[in-house]
Amino acid sequence: MADIRQENADAAARVLFDAGFNVCTATVDVSSRTSVQALVEAATKLGEVSGVIYAAGVSRSQASPETILKVDLYGTGLVLEEFGNVIARGGAGVVFASQSGHRLGPLTTEQNALLAMTPVEDLLALPMLQLDQIKDSLHAYQISKRGNSLRVMAEAVRWGKRGARVNTISPGIIITALANDKLKGPRGPGYRRMLEVSAAGRAGTPYEVGTVGALLMSPDGAFIT
């Protein structure tokens, strides 16, 4: 269990420990290759890495476009690459993207390929990701989340060569502390409108998202990648 803040990792670990799981914690900055490599090293010292669940990220209301691209896009590519180098045969990964990535307008075939295949260290240098092309934090967030889905599609091939799988989940509005704050804030009417016109007609719960993640990580999801 890793987080950029040790206290967050410890709090989550206590919940799991009280439910009967053995948990180790670490800090990680996903925008730093050195930090991610240290996390991979710590994980491999515990044994085979058979599962990776990645939910790190910052939202448009929390950060600048530069930070969003560095954490949500570059960081995701970095974690996929580094853990993809050690994932065990039969292992699986899940990356939490967002429905926001699917609300971005269509990209060109070339842009899709660049987001999917550009070496991680060259990602943020792409012309399409420069600040004169990124309109605001929402645009940075949407293109990062679109990039997450594209990146996982490409990584699924590489992970597959190791006998492992990787998928993304792009949830809609899920009721968390952050979502409740947004519903009560200035953007609340827009979020409530999204819920009203959605097919489900309501927000989701973390448990409901978790059941999808459990399927993708389990042998029952062995053909899904």
Label the predicted regions.
Residues 58-62, 89-162, 171-176:
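Catalytic loop of short-chain dehydrogenase/reductase
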Residues 16-34:
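Rossmann-fold cofactor-recognition segment
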Residues 85, 157-158, 222:
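Alpha-helical segment proximal to the catalytic Tyr-Lys
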Residues 133-134, 138, 189-208:
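Catalytic Tyr-x(3-8)-Lys segment
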Residues 202-225:
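C-terminal substrate-recognition "lid" of short-chain dehydrogenase/reductases
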Residues 31-48:
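Conserved Rossmann-fold cofactor-binding substructure of NAD(P)-dependent oxidoreductases
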Residues 1-12:
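Conserved glycine-rich Rossmann-like NAD(P)H-binding loop of the short-chain dehydrogenase/reductase
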